[in-house]
Amino acid sequence: MPAYLLLLACNVLLVLGAHVQRELVLTWEEGAPNGQSRQMIKTNGQFPSPTLIFDEGDDVEIVVRNYMHENTTIHWHGILMQDTPWSDGVPGLSQKPIEPGESYVYRFTAYPPGQYWYHSHSRATLLDGLYGALFIRRKPGTAGPWAMISEDPEDIAAMERASNNPHIMMLSDWDYYNSTQYKEADANSRLQIFCVDSILLNGKGSVYCPGHQWLIDKQIPFMHKSWPNDTITDKGCFPFVPSTEGPWLADGNVSAIPPGLQEGCVPYSGPTEAIEVDPADRWASVNWIGGSTFKTLQPTIDEHEMWIYEVDGHYIEPRRADTFLIWAGERYSAMIRLDKKPMDYSIRVPDGGYSQMIAAFGILRYKNGDPNARQKPDRFGVTTISKPYFDYNAWPMRDAVFLDKLDLPPWPRKVPAAHGDDMHVLYLGKANSTWEFTLSGKKKYPPDRSAYEPLLYNVNSEQAHDDDLIIRTQNGTWQDIVLQVGHSPLWPVDFPHAVHKHANKYWRIGGGQGLWNYSSVEEAMADQPESFNMVNPPYRDTFLTEFTGAMWVVLRYQVTSPGAWLLHCHFEMHLDNGMAMAILDGVDKWPHVPPEYTQGFHGFREHELPGPAGFWGLVSKILRPESLVWAGGAAVVLLSLFIGGLWRLWQRRMQGTYYVLSQEDERDRFSMDKEAWKSEETKRM
């Protein structure tokens, strides 16, 4: 190959990115992330799922093999899925469920760069452990906002290195009861339950039982005001009150809650997460992921201030903070200066005070730190002598700076269009019970809706035209989504909702108290200009409603990625109990779905199909009609097309037959006992 062609090929690869393949094997087995054993989901034998790291622009191919007893899918949270909507991972929208014993191929471009994560999107199985971090490194030479933190060239270089080699901290909650049992507890008790056993840091934690009276003494003023005649349980769980249960509180049956879920604390000791930093690096990036299913968490690192420089995978103008509230689905990347005395410092992550008094503890460990800088373990096993910002109850112990979540302007500046083309007003809230929800205000979105007839494949179906659950948009248009909570006099105060849209980031251009009584966003802007920000509005993929009574939020985005996408609350039980809608973006430019997805091959291309099906795919490539045409003249053309057509019809049927047989073989393998399966897997590997 001439040298210039080789150079050109290398440049093309740099632009397009490498082809990267990964395999995720899902199993249902015993685990004890907080010291208490239960059945759970493991990925490649571990929990949390493996951290996936790609370079910006990589061509990613991930084979997911389901060896569990239930079907599943995986969503790649925050990835735009431009031109690959069949890989978004939502059953009933972008794919059919991956049944037990089956496999599925996800293909997408690693873009945009930044901190993301992946998790199950089938029923409420996020509670069972299927989630992991996904990080996309920026291209070399990409500018960052480092000079807004420090103008020192050495600091800038150190921060750039740290941003591409972060310490990832997955924050999640965990309970002994699995997702099915938890949902049954909600339904049987007719109550919205928020209680868990543990907060986990990178899948590690313990069950803390500091004592009922100790917890009662730690109650802060708003708690006494919220339940003057009641108290928290020995697990720190809040009592059921009208602000969370609505007018159906009296219908609740606390006795139907399983033992140990709401009260009855039993301590268990599990592992403690520690991240090691080298002060010679000057700076470190700690990337926090809100992988919780219920909890709103408040992370801090003793004696270390944070510079938040990226939110939901997008650079912002850095903001200094000692702590912030991180909700389900959110991500915050924080730069910390490594200039403290070399020793251990506690990482403390309490619940932010919304549903339970509970916390997790980890360690920021300086390399070559002082081994004597320790104390006797306290009631939580903490041995550090560092000074905390907040107590176990999330109450400040000294002056601390909270992050203002409405003051997170994207960097460089990025603003939406001045006017929207369409407006959709959604009335979020309960659906005639404490534990069922609606996003549209009209209907619940069933968790298995159109599961086996994905709307991506059936954009003109009857289910794709249900105005109560479906929004249809035109490509290139600007859409305004108005989220209204507290609109019903039956429940004027509603618990916050973390609303996430697939395939898009969007701007929060406005928000205000009261009821939305406007025919357009422009009318509202004219009436309440102080409630809108069109200069530097926050830009991310997850936004919140507020716990302040009736209020509204206006979100704006442009339709640039046609496909079937989900809009939903990221609290797992809210989603599984109905708080979602489908947005069919760009119905006028609907994507063509490749045959390997529409024809039941689960993303496997002809030559990739297992067993004999793969053989027939290879043979078909050799004997397809166009190959015969190349070998003959004009007289052969008609004959080759005729023979080739018959051959393609026959081999397609055979290929499908062998694929079905291969999947049945996978199910047979799945049904073997656990030890035999592991032995078989060892042989295959």
Curated annotation (Swiss-Prot):
Q: Which reaction does it catalyse?
A: 4 semiviriditoxin + O2 = 2 (M)-viriditoxin + 2 H2O
Matches recorded under Pfam families? Cu-oxidase, Cu-oxidase_2, Cu-oxidase_3
Q: Which residues are glycosylated?
A: 71, 178, 229, 253, 432, 475, 517
Gene Ontology cellular component annotations, sorted alphabetically: membrane
Chief subcellular site?
Answer: membrane
**Residues that bind Cu cation 2:** 77, 119
Loss of this gene results in the following: Impairs the dimerization of 2 semi-viriditoxin molecules to yield the final viriditoxin.
Cellular compartments annotated: Membrane
Amino acids binding Cu cation 3: 121
Molecular functions per Gene Ontology: copper ion binding; oxidoreductase activity; polyketide synthase activity
Can you tell me which residues bind Cu cation 1? 75
Query: What residue intervals traverse the membrane?
Result: 627-647
Q: Give the signal sequence positions.
A: 1-17
Name the positions where Cu cation 4 binds: 500
Q: Does the keyword Glycosyltransferase apply?
A: no
| Keywords tagged on the record | Copper, Glycoprotein, Membrane, Metal-binding, Oxidoreductase, Repeat, Signal, Transmembrane, Transmembrane helix
Does the record carry Ligase as a key word?
no
EC number(s) stated in the UniProt entry for this protein: 1.-.-.-
Give the record's membrane topology: Single-pass membrane protein
Family the entry assigns = Belongs to the multicopper oxidase family.
| Protein name, UniProt field | Multicopper oxidase VdtB
Which organism does this sequence originate in?
Answer: Byssochlamys spectabilis
